[in-house]
């Protein structure tokens, strides 16, 4: 027996599918984590082809409260110590499995130098991953964020993931996290 759908049913199915494809999961807004107001004004041209994954090399956080504090600490360091207009990353990932909005999808980051900042989204895992791996929940959060970015047109469908060390002289994103992202389907070496 074949199924026949009315035009209204097709519209409903399309809307349901569109919603599922664009679900961005849990992104903690700047307001929710207590961010200072951004002074950044440069827009990021979209869709973006590259994503640079780094680690903060600082303290690990594994609860929403500790990750909110850590996001504030990173922003404080970038703004007050380095003199930047905001936290350098577009997004931060906590070991609580949540994504924390940094500069977001639309604002030029300060994460990978003058060559890569204008053409890449910067995602940084909060913690030091030289000798340990992030928990599965944090890795899933990053993958969901990337899928969301592609579904919503912030990233090109053929976007490429790079490790921070692929584009700059650094140990970031740490040896263990770097091994993991090299297995991701969109990872490409420079």
UniProtKB/Swiss-Prot annotation:
<keyword id="KW-0295">Fungicide</keyword>
<dbReference type="GO" id="GO:0042834">
    <property type="term" value="F:peptidoglycan binding"/>
</dbReference>
<protein>
    <recommendedName>
        <fullName>Peptidoglycan recognition protein 1</fullName>
    </recommendedName>
</protein>
<feature type="disulfide bond">
    <location>
        <begin position="24"/>
        <end position="148"/>
    </location>
</feature>
<feature type="disulfide bond">
    <location>
        <begin position="61"/>
        <end position="67"/>
    </location>
</feature>
<keyword id="KW-0732">Signal</keyword>
<keyword id="KW-0873">Pyrrolidone carboxylic acid</keyword>
<keyword id="KW-0044">Antibiotic</keyword>
<feature type="domain" description="N-acetylmuramoyl-L-alanine amidase">
    <location>
        <begin position="46"/>
        <end position="174"/>
    </location>
</feature>
<dbReference type="InterPro" id="IPR036505">
    <property type="entry name" value="Amidase/PGRP_sf"/>
</dbReference>
<dbReference type="InterPro" id="IPR015510">
    <property type="entry name" value="PGRP"/>
</dbReference>
<comment type="function">
    <text>Innate immunity protein that plays several important functions in antimicrobial and antitumor defense systems. Acts as a pattern receptor that binds to murein peptidoglycans (PGN) of Gram-positive bacteria and thus provides bactericidal activity. Forms an equimolar complex with heat shock protein HSPA1A and induces programmed cell death through apoptosis and necroptosis in tumor cell lines by activating the TNFR1 receptor on the target cell membrane. In addition, acts in complex with the Ca(2+)-binding protein S100A4 as a chemoattractant able to induce lymphocyte movement.</text>
</comment>
<dbReference type="GO" id="GO:0008745">
    <property type="term" value="F:N-acetylmuramoyl-L-alanine amidase activity"/>
</dbReference>
<keyword id="KW-0399">Innate immunity</keyword>
<dbReference type="GO" id="GO:0005576">
    <property type="term" value="C:extracellular region"/>
</dbReference>
<feature type="disulfide bond">
    <location>
        <begin position="40"/>
        <end position="85"/>
    </location>
</feature>
<keyword id="KW-0964">Secreted</keyword>
<dbReference type="GO" id="GO:0050830">
    <property type="term" value="P:defense response to Gram-positive bacterium"/>
</dbReference>
<dbReference type="Pfam" id="PF01510">
    <property type="entry name" value="Amidase_2"/>
</dbReference>
<comment type="similarity">
    <text>Belongs to the N-acetylmuramoyl-L-alanine amidase 2 family.</text>
</comment>
<dbReference type="GO" id="GO:0016019">
    <property type="term" value="F:peptidoglycan immune receptor activity"/>
</dbReference>
<feature type="modified residue" description="Pyrrolidone carboxylic acid">
    <location>
        <position position="22"/>
    </location>
</feature>
<dbReference type="GO" id="GO:0009253">
    <property type="term" value="P:peptidoglycan catabolic process"/>
</dbReference>
<dbReference type="InterPro" id="IPR006619">
    <property type="entry name" value="PGRP_domain_met/bac"/>
</dbReference>
<keyword id="KW-0391">Immunity</keyword>
<dbReference type="GO" id="GO:0031640">
    <property type="term" value="P:killing of cells of another organism"/>
</dbReference>
<dbReference type="InterPro" id="IPR002502">
    <property type="entry name" value="Amidase_domain"/>
</dbReference>
<dbReference type="InterPro" id="IPR017331">
    <property type="entry name" value="Peptidoglycan_recognition"/>
</dbReference>
<comment type="subunit">
    <text>Homodimer; disulfide-linked.</text>
</comment>
<dbReference type="GO" id="GO:0045087">
    <property type="term" value="P:innate immune response"/>
</dbReference>
<keyword id="KW-1015">Disulfide bond</keyword>
<dbReference type="GO" id="GO:0050832">
    <property type="term" value="P:defense response to fungus"/>
</dbReference>
<feature type="signal peptide">
    <location>
        <begin position="1"/>
        <end position="21"/>
    </location>
</feature>
<dbReference type="GO" id="GO:0016045">
    <property type="term" value="P:detection of bacterium"/>
</dbReference>
<dbReference type="GO" id="GO:0008270">
    <property type="term" value="F:zinc ion binding"/>
</dbReference>
<keyword id="KW-0929">Antimicrobial</keyword>
């Amino acid at each position: 027996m074949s199924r026949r759908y009315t035009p209204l049913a097709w519209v409903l199915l399309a809307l349901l599918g569109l919603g599922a494809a664009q679900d961005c999961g849990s992104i903690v807004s700047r307001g929710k984590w207590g961010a200072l107001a951004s002074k950044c004004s440069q827009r990021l041209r979209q869709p973006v082809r590259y994503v640079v994954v780094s680690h903060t090399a600082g303290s690990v956080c594994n609860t929403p409260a500790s990750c909110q504090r850590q996001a504030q600490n990173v922003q404080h360091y970038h703004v007050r110590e380095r003199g930047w207009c905001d936290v350098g990353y577009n997004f931060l990932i906590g070991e609580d499995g949540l994504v924390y909005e940094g500069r977001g999808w639309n604002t030029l980051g300060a994460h990978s130098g003058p060559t890569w900042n204008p053409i890449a989204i910067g995602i940084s895992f909060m913690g030091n991953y030289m000798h340990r791996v992030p928990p599965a929940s944090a890795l899933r959060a990053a993958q969901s964020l990337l899928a969301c970015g592609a579904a919503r047109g912030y990233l090109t469908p053929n976007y490429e993931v790079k490790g921070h060390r692929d584009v700059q002289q650094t140990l970031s994103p740490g040896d263990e996290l770097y091994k993991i992202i090299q297995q991701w389907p969109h990872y490409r070496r420079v």
